């Protein structure tokens, strides 16, 4: 590399958290030279809050990232110490994996993957300014005054934009505990026209393992079933060396919290925190204030890794003073002698209004400037990583001169996430939930590769052999379903006795294995006794069983998707003059001008746009086409 090339790159990624990692790796693997600027290169992919990946909806996102060619699932498999499948009894639409990771090893592994990629340079630097020229991004300036030039810039700053930590009435600037904040970049974004807001989040205290009495807590071991996040990895059973533990708060805990509320930066007499916090991950003082009737709340005591004695107190996030934290924690069963190694804290930070972005995550204000992760108003490692890979892919595709990758709401949770952000915006930290996805029975944990591998292959992040494997799987699933339709089972005493013993009604006439499998009491494995040629591939069997048992619901959902696609494919010109559209309400005009929806479908999802506005818009567009 020539010395002058050391400051010139194709893509510059600002930040090396979960969004930055996926963005950098995607762009680099698609053939572009990438610079990653991190406040601290030793905390790449850090898990500053819970040491876990996955959970409802979020676990599906991890698999979607994997199907697109991302890294989060693989690194989770490499570093996990405890893994479980959640919501097994609730059906396939809401099942999801959640793994405890060794957070130190996870970070080291991700750093290594960035450093060993020949197209990536990982470097320390706090970005202070975005450079632009004629409405197009040109590069960045760091805290040393160094100009780095890039054709595209991806901002993934997490909680670092003017980050401020709160512990009681003590407050100090930080991107997270022990790390410098980015104090000047927000000013640069505001100068470029970006609307900026303020959110807050928090994390619990960490306590020393030897000070915990696990004997009075409920043990939660890793799964007995072989599991893996990545479709590229072989599922395995982990040793039961790192269980999680469940305990609960009690009335004494809540009394201590109420006693110290006046010193809370959120509820105290001196209100220090103005930012809105996450609804679905409230602090313990939030729970005590808002749910006065609850006598206890769950606390999960989780290991942070193999080579550390620190445990994470999931459920005890707080910004109360240190003295209050000690008393509160020691009032909990099993934590009576707990030694705090790191105090809990709240952190307030800047985010941009994501309605200023296209669905590609490119800014509407500055060409080739992308944003991903918490800077867009989301919460969660998985949500950040999902945005990161999309931003990285789209930055690379634009530099190639190719069409962007925009995942629909009917295709992926990542599509739901990004559409919600750019269409509806955020007034609190956004967390993905299964309830946000209208088509969640189609967006399952088990079929992410069947849904998305084609896109990963198209952009060059998925190898040909894996894509062919997915196509083969799809073919074998369809062939097996057709075979089951053709295999008839005739009534007999033996068969009817078997069916009765399984809790289902006996046969009165010949019926196919396909129709028998629809019965809720029967599974593919129980039908093996009636099947002359059963399939032994568990992946095929799982897909066949879900598709047969839920056929009616799935078919209905596909019909709904067809209606959805009709409006999604009805394009709205970006430069449409909404003032020229007759009979549009003033509110509709204002919101349509701000969002500039790419389709009628997206316009329909903008809050405040009513059906008559949509009808008037369609009438106007139809007339323009004539």
Curated annotation (Swiss-Prot):
<dbReference type="InterPro" id="IPR044920">
    <property type="entry name" value="MnmG_C_subdom_sf"/>
</dbReference>
<dbReference type="InterPro" id="IPR020595">
    <property type="entry name" value="MnmG-rel_CS"/>
</dbReference>
<comment type="similarity">
    <text>Belongs to the MnmG family.</text>
</comment>
<dbReference type="InterPro" id="IPR047001">
    <property type="entry name" value="MnmG_C_subdom"/>
</dbReference>
<dbReference type="GO" id="GO:0005829">
    <property type="term" value="C:cytosol"/>
</dbReference>
<dbReference type="InterPro" id="IPR002218">
    <property type="entry name" value="MnmG-rel"/>
</dbReference>
<feature type="binding site">
    <location>
        <begin position="277"/>
        <end position="291"/>
    </location>
    <ligand>
        <name>NAD(+)</name>
    </ligand>
</feature>
<keyword id="KW-0285">Flavoprotein</keyword>
<dbReference type="GO" id="GO:0050660">
    <property type="term" value="F:flavin adenine dinucleotide binding"/>
</dbReference>
<dbReference type="Pfam" id="PF21680">
    <property type="entry name" value="GIDA_C_1st"/>
</dbReference>
<comment type="function">
    <text>NAD-binding protein involved in the addition of a carboxymethylaminomethyl (cmnm) group at the wobble position (U34) of certain tRNAs, forming tRNA-cmnm(5)s(2)U34.</text>
</comment>
<dbReference type="InterPro" id="IPR040131">
    <property type="entry name" value="MnmG_N"/>
</dbReference>
<dbReference type="InterPro" id="IPR026904">
    <property type="entry name" value="MnmG_C"/>
</dbReference>
<keyword id="KW-0274">FAD</keyword>
<keyword id="KW-0963">Cytoplasm</keyword>
<feature type="binding site">
    <location>
        <begin position="15"/>
        <end position="20"/>
    </location>
    <ligand>
        <name>FAD</name>
    </ligand>
</feature>
<dbReference type="GO" id="GO:0002098">
    <property type="term" value="P:tRNA wobble uridine modification"/>
</dbReference>
<dbReference type="GO" id="GO:0030488">
    <property type="term" value="P:tRNA methylation"/>
</dbReference>
<dbReference type="InterPro" id="IPR049312">
    <property type="entry name" value="GIDA_C_N"/>
</dbReference>
<keyword id="KW-0520">NAD</keyword>
<dbReference type="InterPro" id="IPR004416">
    <property type="entry name" value="MnmG"/>
</dbReference>
<keyword id="KW-0819">tRNA processing</keyword>
<dbReference type="Pfam" id="PF13932">
    <property type="entry name" value="SAM_GIDA_C"/>
</dbReference>
<comment type="subunit">
    <text>Homodimer. Heterotetramer of two MnmE and two MnmG subunits.</text>
</comment>
<dbReference type="InterPro" id="IPR036188">
    <property type="entry name" value="FAD/NAD-bd_sf"/>
</dbReference>
<dbReference type="Pfam" id="PF01134">
    <property type="entry name" value="GIDA"/>
</dbReference>
<protein>
    <recommendedName>
        <fullName>tRNA uridine 5-carboxymethylaminomethyl modification enzyme MnmG</fullName>
    </recommendedName>
</protein>
